[in-house]
Structure formats: C-alpha cells, structure tokens
A protein has these predicted regions:
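Beta/alpha (TIM)-barrel catalytic core signal, keyed to glycine-rich beta->alpha loops juxtaposed to Asp/Glu
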Residues: 2-169
Length: 169
C-alpha cells in the first residue's frame, strides 16, 4: 500500500515551531487530498495546523476555486497566491509584443499553458475589459485576485520599479 509522510513532516515542523524558528505552518503546490491529509494528521495527533497554502492563482489559472477554495474557507486557511500575473502574461506585454528578450515565457517555454490559443484569447478579452474600465490589465488582474474571499495575500514579482509601482497602485 501507499505510505505517505504527512505525520512525519508535521512532527518535524512541530519541533521547529517549539525551537522558535517558525511560528506557523503552510504548504505549497498542494491539492485538496494532500491538504486534507495535513489537516487530519494535525487534528488527530495534536500537531500544528496549516494556516496557509501557496498555490498559483490568477485570471488564467483558477484550479484553486474548486475543492481547495471550499477547504480553505471551512478550515480557515489563507491562500498566498503566487503568479497572480500568470508569469507576466497578464501585463499584456506578450500580446502587445513588448516582452523583453529575458521575459520568463521566452526563457522558459515549458510554461506554455499561458501562451496557448485559449490563454491568448482570454488575455485579449481581459485587456479590452480593463481598458474599457480605465485600468491596465495588470491592475485589473491583481484586483481580481485581491478580491477573492479566500486570499490572504498575493505574491507579486516585478522586474523594475515601474512594474512594482503599477502592481501596488
């Protein structure tokens, strides 16, 4: 049978908490099954409960909205959304042709999910909606993520000061 190590991981994290090196426990890139395993192990063995989950979340990447959103709501677990700009796609730079040579999707083509025909079409439609409402695509994309009730914080990445200013505006 399949054996997992959720209990062992939580025991080790409990020791790190007790040593004062960390205060709380979170997970990353986990699905609904794994999240529930962590929660059950914590509850059944008086171990630390996870309080955050760090997963990708954006207008173009929304699997969290399924079972994980319900788990997060019911168990009071906050989402730390990474890649809320879908690796820069939701800045509009790829469809506008202004992406630098060192842009992520040019350097890492394996992230093709954001440059598929469907993603490109969705990005064009989102850009139109943003412009019709007096926002940049980046501002609208971050506003969408920030308005989710299960969000604790988003994790933005900016290559320059101009991008950072637009992201926090």
């Amino acid at each position: 049978p399949w054996e997992d190590n959720f209990n062992e991981i939580l025991h080790n994290l409990d020791e790190i908490i007790k040593s004062g090196k960390i205060r709380e426990v979170g997970i990353s890139n986990e699905g609904a099954w794994g999240t529930m395993r962590y929660l059950n192990e914590a509850k059944n063995n008086s171990l630390p409960k996870i309080i955050t989950i760090q997963n990708a979340y954006s207008l173009l990447c929304r699997p969290f909205e399924g079972d994980l959103a319900e788990i997060a709501h019911r168990e009071n677990i906050g989402l730390l959304a990474y890649s809320p700009m879908a690796l820069g796609v939701l800045s509009g730079k790829y469809i506008k042709g202004t992406a630098a040579d060192n842009a992520r999707l040019k350097l890492f083509p394996r992230f093709a999910r954001y440059s598929s025909e469907q993603s490109t079409e969705a990005t064009k439609r989102y850009l139109k909606i943003a412009e019709e409402n007096g926002m940049t695509l980046a501002q609208m994309s971050l506003a969408f993520v920030n308005e989710r009730p299960f969000l604790t914080s988003n994790i933005i990445g900016a290559t320059n000061l101009e991008q950072l200013e637009e992201n926090i505006e």
